[in-house]
């Protein structure tokens, strides 16, 4: 936009259309470096802005705006435009036109809701999904009458431009609005129509008034109100759009000569009829069905018999029923209002509603199949009655027509029974047909209303609203036609775009070669519409009996596959894609089409009997109108009988019109209409699928830009000069680049001088810009280069300006200091003088006398003043005289002052501008400096953050190591605490005197030891689980590092590793916390036990209960640990999400520190508890000190037991220490693996770089070879062309020779009659030249449009071809005529004037012929009337054509000269030629055969050379790849010996292939040398043949013999070459069998080198990925192998431990047996003891009873002990149920303990009352009990040890199994990789076979070309024979001329060859050629 009016900037809609000056200036001042700023691909945003940091070879390291630093390939970077182009309004002005810049500009503008953007001729519109204030009347007023570049991009700007072009140029206009469904096409169409209605308003009511005066409206209202009517019947809800137009329309708004609105009309295309009977999920039928059912008019549904709910009617209730935000009731009111304004009568609208309701009733008609019959019958008639009533027909006849239609069999009409499927098809087809014809009637009725007959129509503006290009998962018949329409529209745009470009280049006087890009799409268009194309074959299949969709698809494949570049076999479906039968390469991409239902949709059959009923409807006049043009079979038969012309549309007896024919006819009409208009293009874009405002889906938008042709338009722009600037603008902006040259006042001269200066400096070349009349044109990217130069110069100027200012300020400061110094010196001098004089006496006297002297001197002063006054008066007088003189001078000077003032004001303005620019520069500098400082600060912050991250990582690693050390310290402290506890327990046990208390304390300590061992075991398990977690985390870290290697994000990798470590640390800390809690619980339990002991075991039972509760808590904790382990696995799966929560790591770390502090506090508390325990132990020791002496013997026994316990505890502690050391080793190993991975990463990077460099070298070598090959191919083609040109030249010369001979005969008879016709013939010649020029222009126009007219009919195409040939012959005849005229002139000058009457007759004949030629030309003009516009524009080619005519005349003169020479030669050697003609013919035939063989051999050799070259190149690269892949596969799944064997085999194969290649190359070189020799020999033979024609008979005979010998040698050479070729083919087959991976590269080499490069890159990346995966798998296998070996070693150790355990178990069983015997003995001893106690307590009956009870309880204990022993035996026999039986054993033991404690209490009570004897007896009994309990405890300890060892064994075994499973899983993965590679090889082999087939097809094409060459050679021979005949005729004519030299020619003899006869002769010659 060149400028925005200030008034418009205040409009509310301006922020959504344009950018303010301040915002644009701020954007332009943003820092930018064109060498660093770029776009790079991004998977989410499409492209993202980045800044280049460094470049290494083809790799570039960039930092994106997101802050990520990545490395990409250089060719992936796209240039970024300078900031001045940000949010540019016309993307064609972008200096770098690429996808990234276009997408970025659209995204930036759409963020500000600026939805309109220009792209050259396009106006791109993005759906805002919200209401914007940019369509108000105020906005319309701002755009009315404004040029496009004066206002921001808007639909109104394009509309107004179209309106002004129509009014000014008197030319019809068109606006093409395209886009996907939901892009806003319909809304923009309505806005355009409204704008035209307002602009061309007539302000007069043009609507047709009804009788009541209520119907109708103004013409403007009626044009606008067509939209509600069309939307009601033509719009529907789709998945992507709630109001989607399901038809295309072309709305023409007509205007009068003065620009007033004069009516309008509508044409529609491609209505989606299938929606009437079928809707997809998420969609619904057309709006009118739901508006009728909305209840807006309650009586309407009753009239239409729609009594049921909408869901009842199947045709319109298959999916959605309502639309969010749309009120069907209100929409019905608007539709009815639109009907009223449009002037529809009530009966017309009611018929429309009735027909619509009839379709709804038809959908509910039910039919059923008769049993055992192929006949359907009605299943209920209610809906049929309703449907028939609505359609105005009889229900019975309607049902009969559907179930038993009348068909013609021979000459009779019979009723044919229909099955159920056929009836349903007939109902659906009839419903669709009724709706389609009803819609067409509505269009016709609206056109009738909009026809304002009272206003004359002069011009129109058409608006095309049609669906854009569609690529769906399943593409069918509809998509084919939509895409074909868009293909034609895109071709129209390409052609129109470059026509405009060429016109502007010509206006500006720029040399330019026209390129018609419309021809780029011609191949695809011809594939679809040409004869034997897709549509032609479809129409043919529709009339072929028993044709199916599959036969149609197969015909397409047979006809076009491999023969047409735009036809392909579809690739297998991916994702949700459906099956496809063929694929077409459109301009927007390759589309896969499914041919299902193609035939049915194309035929669109109807039931003629039912249609006949509808044509005779009695109650619905609409049916009569819509079916009026339909001709049924019966009507056609009757018309045929009556001899009438069948004018119906369809009927089998009449012409059969398919849907494709109808579509093609309407499309051709549309294209013809568009070619007669000046088009304007609107492209609508969907921003996202979510209908969210301001959000851009980059991938979706890019796809639409491709489909809409925007990127295609940009591609075309780049071919020319897309950037252009006016001379004043260029001078104003870039004058700084060449200040001297810019001093010119003429902007053009100044601009040219600036460009010359830049070109001389080497910054620009002449090809990068062109100088026009008013503008300068630039290639893409040049303006960016100029901006860089301007920025550099500005930087230098600003720097110099700053230095000058600093210099000036420094000099001013120096001057100020100098002046200050001078003043100071004067003051100092005066002060020093005053200091000297102030003490001098004379000075004092002077000071006193000086005041007194003033009074005496006043008189003298007065005298002096009088003298001065006199002098002053004289001076005043003189001043008055001078003043009078000066006043006159002042008057003159005032005028000069005014003039100077004006110039001063101008200079001030310039100075103000300069100051303003200076100020802006300063602001810009300040802004840049501030941004630079900000960026520097950001860079420093980023560096600091990186350093902080590194420090945090180091700190985290240190914290982790500290944590592990702390864990080790905790373990040491735990062990110390355990040792201290054991020592305290030992002291307690050693000090216990009382037997019962000591036994109880020992049992308690054993239990506590068990608990402690259980906690240690849990801790060991936790440590083992942590080890497993660490291993698992190491694997995850390796995978993450692999991903980071692929993405080369080292920082993210470190962060993720840190996160993993942090997580592991938190897990370890959590587990430690759990373990610490367990320890705390145990400590509490221990404290409770000691309290219980201090209270003399009174609460022992309660304590045991608490212990049981604690056991349950421990079990719960174990379950919690398992749950946490499962949760850990889930968290590991969420590891990817943890990367986004890096900020939480600090908080987690602080929480971990707090937990460590809490852990430390708890440890301290534990230390306090230990101190309390010591105090309690001391008290307990004091209480039992008195019993120490009595228990010394028992203490010794207990000391032995305690020492064994201490030993076992020490073993457990040592085991824990060993496990901790193992963890440390694993950590060190993981660190070593990490460093190894780092080294591997660096090595892989180096390998990748070397691979890239080698690939670049290979690409360079490949390019060099291809250049060499292209040069050789060019040379070969040149030689072939020379051969062909020679043959054609000879043929043409012979033909022209014969023509000239005939002309010579005629001219010799009329030489004396041409002088008087000189002027007449000259004028006729000028007329003929004009006719020729016109025909030349017509030929060019016809050539440009022939592609668009080929679809009319076959006869017209043939006629056009003949006319083109006739025109070419006519051109040659005109050239000959010019030469003849020159000859006539010469002869006339020499021979004088004769035979005036004959000349007059010849003149008349010539005029008649000229008139015939003129009539022919006029016929051609009528045929190509559609190209008149192009023909007028090509008038400028007249001069070129004239020069061509002159050149042709010169060539004819040259040929005439040669003809005379040939005449002398022919006259001299005629006789000899006749004798030797047969021999010459034989020699020539042999020569032609030899040339054919040579050409064939050369072609085969070229193909073989190309194949061998590509084979050699690809063999080298692919052999290396095969070697690498084989090495990798060998490393992954084979042994070293197999790998070496494969390597040797591959090396042998490689050597064989290399030898074969060398042999093939040698053979190829030999063949090339032979071909060259053969060509040289052929050229020599030809030269010799031509020389022998002019030499004597003897030389001719020698030449013939030499030629014969040469032929024999060539024959031998050809036979040798044939053998060598067979050998080469054998080698080629061998190479094809050996190399299976060549197909992709070969296929791509045949198609395009660029595709080959992409494929090579793709496979190189694949190889790198496979190599990396195999290396990773190899490393994992090595680890697994090591782990497996270690597992085997551990299994061996476990096996030995198992054997030891078995031995221990046997020892335990023996001990149990001994214990059982001892129990028996103890029982007997107890019995004796009981008897003794009962004897001693005879005197105390009461105590005796109690003692007996105690003995009974002891017996019960013995029984329980026996049961416990049996349970132990069962536990050793059944290891699987050991844990459960152990718990049962523990429960029994606790029960025994409780019984024993009760007994001990009873014994204590008895001890008080028993005497010493009883105490002694009881002492003996207690000893026995103590021994028994000691044995029980020993057995329990052995059981516990065995259980722990068994658990350890099971745990190790589970670990080994897990690792074995991992190994098996990795082996399976390797097998899968091998299978994938095998599949890849199979695919390559299949493609190689396809390539072989293509090679064979190419050979067939070559053979056909050779056959054609042979045919041409035969024609050449015939031409020579005709030349002989012509020579004979010439001699005869000469004799005849001599005989009749003195005789006048007869009357009517044609003196001048007529143009038509010449045309016929040339046509015959052309056909002969």
Swiss-Prot record:
Its main location: cytoplasm. Keywords: Actin-binding, ATP-binding, Coiled coil, Cytoplasm, Methylation, Motor protein, Muscle protein, Myosin, Nucleotide-binding, Thick filament. Residues 942-966, 1006-1029, 1131-1213, 1234-1255 are annotated as: Disordered. It is found in: Cytoplasm, Myofibril; Cytoplasm, Myofibril, Sarcomere, A band. Disruption phenotype: Worms exhibit retarded embryonic development and paralysis. Muscle organization shows disruption with abnormalities of both the filament lattice that constitutes the A-band and the hypodermal cell. RNAi-mediated knockdown causes an accumulation in the proximal gonad of endomitotic mature oocytes in 51 percent of animals. It comes from the Eukaryota. ATP binds at residues 179-186. The modification N6,N6,N6-trimethyllysine is found at residue 130. It holds the Pfam family Myosin_tail_1. GO terms for biological process: locomotory behavior; muscle contraction; positive regulation of ovulation; sarcomere organization. Residues 86-791 form the Myosin motor domain. Residues 794-823 form the IQ domain. SMART domains: MYSc. There are four different myosin heavy chains in C.elegans. The rodlike tail sequence is highly repetitive, showing cycles of a 28-residue repeat pattern composed of 4 heptapeptides, characteristic for alpha-helical coiled coils. Belongs to the TRAFAC class myosin-kinesin ATPase superfamily. Myosin family. Essential for muscle contraction. Involved in ovulation likely by regulating the contraction of gonadal myoepithelial sheath cells. PANTHER family: MYOSIN, MYOSIN-11. Muscle myosin is a hexameric protein that consists of 2 heavy chain subunits (MHC), 2 alkali light chain subunits (MLC) and 2 regulatory light chain subunits (MLC-2). This is Myosin-3. It comes from Caenorhabditis elegans.
């Amino acid at each position: 936009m060149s400028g925005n009016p200030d008034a418009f900037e205040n409009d509310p809609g301006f922020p959504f259309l344009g950018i303010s000056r301040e915002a644009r200036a701020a954007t332009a001042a943003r820092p930018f470096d064109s060498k660093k700023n770029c776009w790079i691909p991004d998977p989410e945003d499409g492209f993202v802005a980045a800044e280049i940091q460094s470049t290494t070879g083809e790799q570039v390291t960039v930092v994106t705006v997101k802050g990520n630093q990545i490395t990409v390939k250089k060719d992936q970077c796209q240039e970024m435009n300078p900031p001045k182009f940000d949010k540019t309004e016309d993307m064609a002005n972008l200096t770098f036109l690429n996808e990234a810049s276009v997408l970025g500009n659209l995204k930036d503008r759409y963020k500000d809701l600026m939805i309109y953007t220009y792209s050259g001729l396009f106006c791109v519109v993005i759906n805002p999904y919200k209401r914007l204030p940019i369509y108000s009347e105020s906005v319309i007023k701002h755009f009315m009458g404004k040029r496009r570049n004066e206002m921001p991009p808007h639909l109104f700007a394009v509309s107004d431009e179209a309106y002004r072009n129509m009014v000014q140029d008197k030319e019809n206009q068109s606006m093409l609005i395209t886009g996907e469904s939901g892009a806003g096409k319909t809304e923009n169409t309505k806005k355009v129509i409204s704008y035209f209605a307002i602009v061309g308003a007539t302000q007069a009511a043009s609507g047709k008034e009804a009788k009541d005066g209520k119907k109708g409206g103004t013409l403007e209202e009626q044009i606008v109100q067509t939209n509600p009517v069309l939307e009601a019947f033509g719009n529907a809800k789709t998945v992507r759009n709630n109001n989607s137009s399901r038809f295309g329309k072309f709305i023409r708004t007509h205007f009068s000569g003065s620009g007033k609105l004069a009516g309008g009309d509508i044409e529609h295309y491609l209505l989606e009829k299938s929606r009437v009977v079928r809707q997809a999920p998420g969609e619904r039928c057309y709006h009118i069905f739901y508006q009728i059912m909305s209840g807006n008019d309650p009586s309407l549904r009753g009239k239409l018999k729609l009594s049921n709910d909408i869901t009842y009617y199947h045709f319109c209730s298959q999916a959605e029923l309502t639309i969010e935000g749309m009120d069907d009731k209100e929409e019905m009111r608007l539709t009815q209002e639109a009907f009223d304004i449009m002037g529809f009568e009530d009966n017309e609208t009611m018929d429309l509603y009735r027909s619509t309701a009839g379709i709804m009733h038809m959908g509910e008609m039910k039919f059923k199949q008769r049993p055992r019959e192929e006949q359907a019958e009605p299943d209920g008639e209610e809906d049929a009655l309703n449907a028939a009533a609505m359609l105005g027909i009889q229900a019975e006849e309607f049902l009969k027509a559907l179930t038993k239609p009348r068909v013609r069999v021979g000459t009779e009409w019979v009723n044919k029974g229909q099955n159920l499927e056929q009836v349903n098809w007939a109902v659906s087809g009839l419903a669709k047909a009724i709706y389609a014809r009803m819609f067409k009637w509505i269009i016709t009725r609206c056109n009738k209303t909009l026809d304002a007959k009272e206003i004359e129509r002069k011009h129109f503006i058409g608006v095309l609203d049609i669906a854009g290009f569609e690529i769906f998962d399943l593409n069918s018949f509809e998509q084919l036609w939509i895409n074909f329409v868009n293909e034609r529209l895109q071709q129209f745009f390409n052609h129109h775009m470059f026509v405009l470009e060429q016109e502007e280049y010509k206006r500006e006087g720029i040399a330019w070669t026209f390129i018609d890009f419309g021809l780029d799409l011609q191949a695809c268009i011809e594939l679809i519409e040409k004869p034997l194309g897709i549509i032609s074959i479809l129409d043919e299949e529709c009339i072929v009996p028993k044709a199916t969709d599959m036969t149609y698809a197969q015909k397409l494949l047979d006809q076009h596959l491999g023969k047409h570049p735009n036809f392909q076999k579809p690739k297998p479906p991916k994702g949700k894609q459906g099956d496809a039968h063929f694929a077409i390469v459109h301009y927007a991409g390759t589309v896969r089409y499914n041919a299902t239902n193609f035939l049915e949709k194309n035929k669109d059959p109807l039931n003629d009997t039912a249609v006949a009923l509808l044509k005779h409807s009695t109650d619905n006049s609409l049916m009569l109108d819509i079916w009026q043009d339909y001709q049924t079979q019966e009507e056609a038969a009757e018309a045929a009988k009556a001899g009438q012309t069948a004018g119906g549309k369809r009927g089998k007896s009449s012409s059969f019109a398919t849907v494709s024919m109808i579509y093609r006819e309407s499309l051709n009409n549309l294209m013809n209409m568009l070619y007669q208009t000046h088009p304007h293009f609107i492209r609508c874009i969907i921003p996202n699928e979510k209908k969210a405002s301001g959000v851009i889906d980059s991938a979706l938008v890019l796809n639409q830009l491709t489909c809409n042709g925007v990127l295609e338009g940009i591609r075309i722009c780049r071919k020319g000069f897309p950037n252009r600037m006016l001379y004043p603008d260029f001078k104003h902006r870039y004058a700084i680049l060449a200040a001297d040259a810019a001093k010119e006042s003429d902007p053009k001269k100044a601009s040219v001088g600036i460009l010359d200066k830049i070109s001389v400096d080497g910054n620009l070349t002449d090809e990068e810009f062109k100088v026009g009349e008013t503008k300068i044109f630039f290639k893409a990217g040049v303006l960016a280069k100029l901006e860089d130069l301007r920025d550099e110069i500005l930087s230098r100027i600003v720097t110099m300006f700053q230095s000058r200012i600093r210099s000036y300020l420094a000099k001013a400061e120096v001057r100020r200091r100098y002046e200050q110094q001078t003043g100071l010196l004067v003051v100092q001098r005066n002060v020093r003088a005053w200091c000297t004089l102030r003490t001098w006496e004379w000075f004092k006297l002077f000071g006193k006398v000086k005041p007194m002297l003033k009074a005496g001197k006043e008189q003298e002063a007065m005298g002096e003043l009088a003298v001065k006054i006199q002098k002053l008066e004289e001076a005043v007088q003189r001043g008055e005289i001078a003043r009078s003189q000066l006043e006159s001078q002042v008057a003159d000077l005032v005028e000069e002052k005014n003039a100077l003032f004006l110039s001063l004001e101008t200079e001030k303005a310039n100075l103000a501008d300069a100051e303003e620019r200076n100020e802006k520069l300063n602001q810009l500098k300040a802004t840049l400096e501030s941004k630079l400082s900000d960026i520097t600060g950001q860079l420093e912050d980023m560096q600091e953050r990186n350093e902080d991250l590194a420090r945090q990582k180091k700190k985290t690693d240190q914290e982790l190591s500290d944590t592990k050390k702390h864990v080790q310290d905790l373990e040491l402290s735990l062990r110390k605490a355990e040792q201290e506890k054991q020592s305290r327990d030992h002291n307690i046990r050693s000090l216990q005197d009382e037997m019962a208390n000591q036994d109880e304390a020992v049992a308690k300590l054993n239990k506590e030891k068990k608990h402690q061992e259980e906690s240690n075991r849990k801790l060991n398990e936790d440590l083992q689980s942590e080890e497993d977690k660490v291993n698992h985390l190491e694997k995850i870290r390796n995978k993450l590092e692999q991903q980071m290697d692929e993405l080369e994000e080292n920082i993210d990798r470190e962060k993720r590793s840190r996160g993993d470590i942090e997580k592991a640390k938190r897990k370890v800390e959590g587990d430690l916390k759990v373990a610490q809690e367990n320890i705390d619980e145990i400590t509490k339990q221990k404290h409770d036990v000691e309290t219980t002991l201090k209270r003399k075991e009174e609460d022992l039972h309660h304590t045991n209960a608490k212990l049981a509760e604690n056991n349950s808590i421990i079990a719960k904790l174990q379950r919690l640990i398992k749950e946490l382990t499962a949760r850990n696995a889930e968290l590991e799966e969420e590891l990817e999400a943890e990367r986004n929560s890096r900020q939480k790591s600090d908080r987690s770390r602080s929480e971990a520190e707090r937990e460590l502090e809490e852990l430390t506090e708890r440890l301290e508390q534990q230390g306090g508890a230990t101190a309390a325990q010591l105090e309690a132990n001391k008290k307990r020791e004091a209480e039992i000190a008195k019993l120490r002496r009595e228990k010394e013997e028992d203490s010794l026994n207990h000391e032995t037991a305690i020492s064994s316990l201490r030993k076992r505890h020490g073993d457990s502690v040592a085991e824990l220490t060993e496990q901790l050391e193992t963890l440390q080793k694993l950590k060190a190993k993981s660190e070593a693996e990490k460093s190894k991975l780092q080294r591997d990463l660096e090595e892989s990077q180096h390998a990748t770089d070397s691979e890239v460099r080698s690939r670049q070298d290979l690409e360079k070598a490949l390019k060099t070879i291809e250049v060499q090959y292209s040069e050789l191919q060019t040379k070969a083609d040149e030689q072939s062309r020379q051969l062909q040109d020679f043959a054609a030249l000879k043929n043409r010369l012979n033909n022209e020779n014969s023509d000239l001979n005939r002309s010579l005969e005629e001219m010799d008879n009329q030489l004396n009659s041409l002088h008087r016709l000189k002027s007449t013939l000259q004028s006729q010649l000028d007329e003929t030249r004009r006719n020729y020029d016109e025909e030349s222009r017509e030929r060019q126009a016809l050539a440009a449009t022939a592609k668009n007219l080929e679809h009319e009919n076959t006869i017209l195409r043939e006629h056009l071809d003949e006319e083109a040939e006739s025109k070419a012959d006519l051109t040659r005849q005109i050239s000959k005529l010019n030469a003849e005229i020159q000859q006539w002139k010469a002869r006339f000058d020499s021979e004088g004037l004769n035979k005036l009457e004959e000349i007059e007759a010849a003149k008349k004949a010539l005029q008649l012929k000229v008139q015939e030629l003129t009539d022919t030309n006029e016929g051609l003009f009528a045929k190509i009337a559609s190209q008149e516009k192009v023909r007028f524009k090509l008038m400028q080619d007249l001069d070129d054509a004239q020069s061509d005519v002159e050149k042709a005349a010169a060539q004819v003169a040259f040929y005439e000269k040669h003809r005379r020479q040939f005449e002398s030669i022919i006259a001299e050697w005629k006789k000899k030629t006749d004798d030797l003609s047969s021999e010459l013919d034989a020699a020539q035939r042999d020569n032609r055969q030899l040339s054919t063989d040579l050409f064939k051999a050369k072609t085969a050799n070229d193909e073989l050379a190309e194949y061998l070259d590509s084979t050699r190149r690809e063999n080298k690269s692919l052999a290396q790849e095969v070697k690498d892949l084989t090495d990798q596969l060998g490393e992954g799944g084979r042994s070293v010996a197999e790998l070496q064997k494969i390597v040797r085999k591959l090396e042998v194969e490689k050597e064989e292939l290399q030898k074969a290649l060398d042999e093939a190359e040698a053979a190829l070189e030999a063949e090339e040398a032979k071909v060259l020799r053969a060509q040289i020999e052929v050229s020599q033979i030809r030269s010799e043949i031509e020389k022998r024609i002019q030499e004597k008979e003897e030389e001719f005979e020698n030449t013939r013999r030499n030629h014969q010998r040469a032929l024999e040698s060539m024959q031998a050479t050809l036979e040798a070459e044939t053998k060598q070729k067979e050998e080469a083919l054998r080698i080629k087959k061998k190479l094809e069998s050996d190399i299976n991976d060549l197909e992709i590269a070969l296929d791509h080499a045949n198609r395009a080198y660029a595709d080959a490069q992409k494929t090579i890159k793709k496979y190189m990346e694949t190889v790198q990925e496979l190599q990396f995966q195999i290396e990773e798998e190899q490393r994992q296998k090595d680890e697994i192998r090591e782990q497996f070996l270690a597992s085997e070693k551990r299994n061996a150790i476990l096996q030995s431990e198992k054997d030891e355990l078995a031995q221990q178990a046997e020892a335990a069983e023996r001990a149990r047996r001994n214990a059982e015997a001892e129990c028996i003995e103890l029982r007997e001893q107890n019995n004796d003891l009981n008897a003794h106690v009962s004897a001693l307590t005879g005197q105390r009956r009461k105590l005796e009873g109690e003692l007996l009870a105690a003995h009974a309880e002891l017996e019960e204990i013995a029984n329980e002990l026996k049961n416990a022993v049996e349970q132990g035996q069962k536990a050793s026999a059944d290891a699987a149920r050991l844990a459960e039986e152990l718990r049962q054993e523990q429960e029994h033991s606790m029960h025994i303990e409780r019984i024993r404690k009760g007994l001990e209490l009873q014994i204590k009570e008895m001890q008080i009352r028993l005497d010493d004897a009883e105490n002694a007896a009881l002492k003996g009994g207690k000893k026995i009990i103590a021994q028994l309990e000691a044995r029980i405890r020993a057995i329990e300890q052995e059981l516990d040890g065995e259980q722990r060892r068994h658990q350890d064994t099971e745990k190790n075994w589970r670990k080994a199994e897990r690792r074995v499973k991992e190994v098996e899983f990795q082996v399976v993965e390797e097998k899968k990789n091998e299978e994938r590679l095998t599949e890849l090889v199979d695919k390559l082999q299949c493609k190689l076979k396809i390539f072989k087939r293509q090679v064979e097809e190419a050979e067939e094409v070559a053979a056909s070309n050779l056959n054609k060459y042979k045919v041409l050679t035969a024609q050449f021979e015939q031409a020579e024979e005709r030349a002989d005949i012509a020579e004979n005729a010439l001699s005869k004519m000469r004799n005849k001329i001599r005989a009749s030299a003195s005789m006048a020619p007869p009357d009517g003899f044609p003196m001048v060859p007529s143009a038509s006869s010449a045309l016929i002769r040339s046509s015959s010659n052309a056909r002969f050629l």
